[in-house]
Amino acid sequence: MSHLTVYRDDDPDDIVLRTDDAAVIADALRGIGARFERWDSPVVPPLDATPDAVLNTYRPYLDELMGETGAGSADVVRINAATPNLTALRDKFLSEHTHSEDEVRFFVHGSGNFVLHVDGRVYDVCCTAGDLISVPRGTPHWFDAGLSPDVVALRVFTDTTGWIADYTGDDIARRFPVS
């Protein structure tokens, strides 16, 4: 189940908010410029569906989202035990970074935590299948799919060159294990 835990950024033991209510999650993230939604698709593609099948399943949602955001492309990413260089990839995601465009993800299968560092707070959002999250450009954050990930997600891009991170150099992600 999706949930949000908010901490003060100087104390990982000081929980400011913890909720699994999607409306409360959306409101809390909206307050920092992020977006969170639940998409209820009548059909969920199988875990081993081809990227095209996954994209086609969610095409109506993607068309609307891409029209709203001006995004130019979408693709499917799978992160699991068979992912080449999984450890190095996880290390990249776990380092606090920003992007020059919004980072938009929709979880088709599995789960992962997007952790946003904004205005003295750490917002740990556990996203599960059916969740859409959009992290605003320039927002320091990191991502953790866990030690044994099994995630399928849609990625939506404005810049067709794909995922490019600008690392902050802050080690805060090491101090805040995901909830």
UniProtKB/Swiss-Prot annotation:
Quote the record's binding site residues for Fe(2+): H97, H99, E103, H141
Q: Which GO molecular function annotations are given, in alphabetical order?
A: acireductone dioxygenase (Ni2+-requiring) activity; acireductone dioxygenase [iron(II)-requiring] activity; iron ion binding; nickel cation binding
Q: Where is this site: Important to generate the dianion?
A: R105
Q: Indicate which residues the UniProt annotation says bind Ni(2+).
A: H97, H99, E103, H141
Full protein name = Acireductone dioxygenase
Q: In which pathway does it act?
A: Amino-acid biosynthesis; L-methionine biosynthesis via salvage pathway; L-methionine from S-methyl-5-thio-alpha-D-ribose 1-phosphate: step 5/6
Q: Known Gene3D superfamilies for this protein?
A: Jelly Rolls (2.60.120.10)
Its annotated function is as follows:
Catalyzes 2 different reactions between oxygen and the acireductone 1,2-dihydroxy-3-keto-5-methylthiopentene (DHK-MTPene) depending upon the metal bound in the active site. Fe-containing acireductone dioxygenase (Fe-ARD) produces formate and 2-keto-4-methylthiobutyrate (KMTB), the alpha-ketoacid precursor of methionine in the methionine recycle pathway. Ni-containing acireductone dioxygenase (Ni-ARD) produces methylthiopropionate, carbon monoxide and formate, and does not lie on the methionine recycle pathway.
What does it catalyze? 1,2-dihydroxy-5-(methylsulfanyl)pent-1-en-3-one + O2 = 3-(methylsulfanyl)propanoate + CO + formate + 2 H(+); 1,2-dihydroxy-5-(methylsulfanyl)pent-1-en-3-one + O2 = 4-methylsulfanyl-2-oxobutanoate + formate + 2 H(+)
What residues does the record give for site: May play a role in metal incorporation in vivo?
A: E96
- Tell me the enzyme class: oxidoreductase
Q: Which GO biological process annotations does it have? A: L-methionine salvage from methylthioadenosine; L-methionine salvage from S-adenosylmethionine
Annotated site (May play a role in transmitting local conformational changes): D102
Gene name as annotated: mtnD
Q: Which Pfam families match?
A: ARD
Instruction: Report keywords, A-Z.
Output: Amino-acid biosynthesis, Dioxygenase, Iron, Metal-binding, Methionine biosynthesis, Nickel, Oxidoreductase
Checking InterPro entries in the record gives: ARD, ARD_bac, RmlC-like_jellyroll, RmlC_Cupin_sf
Q: Which organism is it from?
A: Gluconacetobacter diazotrophicus (strain ATCC 49037 / DSM 5601 / CCUG 37298 / CIP 103539 / LMG 7603 / PAl5)
Entry keyword annotation includes Iron: yes
The record's comment on protein family reads: Belongs to the acireductone dioxygenase (ARD) family.
Q: How does it assemble?
A: Monomer.
Q: Which cofactor does it need?
A: Fe(2+); Ni(2+)
What EC identifiers does the entry list? Answer: 1.13.11.54, 1.13.11.53
| Domain of life of the source | Bacteria
Free-text comment on the cofactor: Binds 1 Fe(2+) cation per monomer.
